[in-house]
Amino acid sequence: MKKAVILLSGGMDSAVVTAIAQSQGFMVHALSIRYGQRHTSELDAAVRIARALNVVAHKVVDVDLRSIGGSALTDDIEIPDAGGEGIPVTYVPARNTIMLSLALGWAEVIGAADIFCGVNAVDYSGYPDCRPQFITAFETLANLATKVGVEGTQLHVHAPLQFLSKAEIVHEGLLHGVDFGLTVSCYRADVDGRACGRCDACKLRAAGFADAGVVDPTRYMELPCSLLLL
């Protein structure tokens, strides 16, 4: 069987991507990054998901992006309830570039030619490293910057959720047997994984379940507007 490295954050998108990769016959090696995020319960979720999906291997790698700063997800910066114009304060500088680079390194070591990530360009919050152009550019980089790429192995970066709405992602996850109750998406999630219900991530998640007509298993401390209107 072919091997693949999947970036597994602990959120719903990466859980669905992990299940998709397995359904395509890949031996899944899941990679989670402890980068200094304040919502550390998502890493606990990543461990739960990896166990539930019975992945071949799961690594949690430490990268201290908090020492660099520049994001409300790592710094003591207020996380807004509503998104504003431009790139939001929850953007972590170069995060996806760094994470994909780590995934690329592990892929080269284990002999995997495929990397999967859960970036989404439809319901994304304005992050530049969630755009299709970024994924295409990184795949080009991967083939230029690695020993295996130079020697002729074609490396692929897959973003199967790239053009799906959150509702479509919910349906895709259910189709592949994902237990969304194991996942954590909230930027302010507490140590037990309970979601705030107010941040942009919570709103997108709740709206996705509502639009899909599926019960949201998330434990919210405060119900998002999309659920209050049901």
UniProtKB/Swiss-Prot annotation:
Q: Which CDD domains match?
A: QueC-like (cd01995)
Q: Which SUPFAM superfamilies match?
A: Adenine nucleotide alpha hydrolases-like
Q: Which GO terms describe its molecular function?
A: ATP binding; ligase activity, forming carbon-nitrogen bonds; zinc ion binding
- Alphabetically list the UniProt keywords: ATP-binding, Ligase, Metal-binding, Nucleotide-binding, Queuosine biosynthesis, Zinc
**Does the UniProt entry include the keyword Nucleotide-binding?**
yes
Q: Where does ATP bind?
A: L8, S9, G10, G11, M12, D13, S14, A15, V16, V17, T18
Instruction: Identify the EC number(s).
Output: 6.3.4.20
Q: Which cofactors?
A: Zn(2+)
Q: Which reaction does it catalyse?
A: 7-carboxy-7-deazaguanine + NH4(+) + ATP = 7-cyano-7-deazaguanine + ADP + phosphate + H2O + H(+)
Pathway membership:
Purine metabolism; 7-cyano-7-deazaguanine biosynthesis
Q: Where does Zn(2+) bind?
A: C186, C196, C199, C202
For this protein, the record's Gene3D superfamilies field holds: HUPs (3.40.50.620)
**BP GO terms, sorted:** queuosine biosynthetic process
Enzyme type, top EC level: ligase
Note accompanying the cofactor annotation: Binds 1 zinc ion per subunit.
UniProt key word Cell inner membrane: no
Q: Which family does it belong to?
A: Belongs to the QueC family.
Q: Which PANTHER family match?
A: 7-CYANO-7-DEAZAGUANINE SYNTHASE (PTHR42914:SF1)
Question: Function, please?
Answer: Catalyzes the ATP-dependent conversion of 7-carboxy-7-deazaguanine (CDG) to 7-cyano-7-deazaguanine (preQ(0)).
Can you name this protein?
A: 7-cyano-7-deazaguanine synthase
Gene coding for it: queC
